[in-house]
Amino acid sequence: MVNRSDLVVIGISVGLALGLLLALLLFFAIKWYYGRSHLRRCANEQNSPTLPVHTAKRGVVIPDDRANTESSQPPENGAPTQHQPWWNNHTKDLTVSASGIPRYNYKDIQKATQNFTTVLGQGSFGPVYKAVMPNGELAAAKVHGSNSSQGDREFQTEVSLLGRLHHRNLVNLTGYCVDKSHRMLIYEFMSNGSLENLLYGGEGMQVLNWEERLQIALDISHGIEYLHEGAVPPVIHRDLKSANILLDHSMRAKVADFGLSKEMVLDRMTSGLKGTHGYMDPTYISTNKYTMKSDIYSFGVIILELITAIHPQQNLMEYINLASMSPDGIDEILDQKLVGNASIEEVRLLAKIANRCVHKTPRKRPSIGEVTQFILKIKQSRSRGRRQDTMSSSFGVGYEEDLSRVMSRIKDQHVELGLLAGVKEENHQERNIATT
């Protein structure tokens, strides 16, 4: 006969067994439920893929509508459509990304640009078109080209960085488009175009006076200073050039095109060569390692462009090296449009800064903060009326006659330096042939 204590033990054992069984069933049920949810999420992600974009503090996801957006046609070169205030009666497919930048669909930009009719320029990302946005403001729509050297990575970098970087000397990104295969970036409209066009655009282009060039150098320096010393983490631009310096209606400069930019997490970083020939730091070219001083080198080249109006791809550095053989060599390669309208002392001071920036040893180049202070001192000296040596005053009596003589001398010097640079290039090519 089973006693009461045995019944109690049996009851407890059965209860524990049932409890354990129920716990196991509950565990497997939860695991099955989450497994189904995960599979469902994966299926949704395959149907609506996304492009991850990372900001300094959180991930930003730019939806990719290649799989679920209504079909749209690429820009055609036909006649422009009649422009109408489409935003008054059109419900835009407009969202705001986590970075705070509005997102437009392809048809929005197509209408804003009047079917991509007015071309403002052409860059490494693709053509740039004039646009009128829903709020009536002018904008520049940069459209990713099929033969572009840049892709989704550069596009994501631009949206990510400009979503968190804001400064008066950086071009403002006001919107973007990700619609099927279309990638577009919408910027504030810069009415005076690029510094490159103003310096080399030929006849009919506005001539930049010396005061404007000095201010442009300071504006660029402020923009880079924000990237290097104000942003957290710091940002290296990696493609500073006159084509990426844009000017507004007041000739104030802003740095543009951040597709190749990198956040600085180490003192120096290794990368495949990216940038533009003529502006790239020779140390970066030889080592594949870039630092903030690589940006300083590129900025130095831009300053020399402002002084000489000689393009880096037209042997600018050869001219500079040859001119440095003479104490007043920079005077000889000064942009002819500035002769008689610039302070020689200021030109020499700015050239001195530029030469430090393009020093072959990166550690001997100044920081961007130092460059800014140097340029500010030149401007402050100008504002206090401390200019002591202008070309017009240095010529003295018979100014017009002397000016004509100086112009002739500068032209002769340009020709002579060009011949010397050509000879040096021929010798370099002969050495290359001899070694192959």
Swiss-Prot record:
Q: Under which main EC class is this enzyme filed?
A: transferase
Phosphotyrosine (modified residue): where?
187, 284
Q: Which residues carry this modification: Phosphothreonine?
A: 276
Q: Which SUPFAM superfamilies match?
A: Protein kinase-like (PK-like) (SSF56112)
Q: Which residues lie within the region annotated Disordered?
A: 65-88
- Localization (cell): Cell membrane
- What family does this belong to? Belongs to the protein kinase superfamily. Ser/Thr protein kinase family.
Q: What is this protein called?
A: Calcium/calmodulin-regulated receptor-like kinase 2
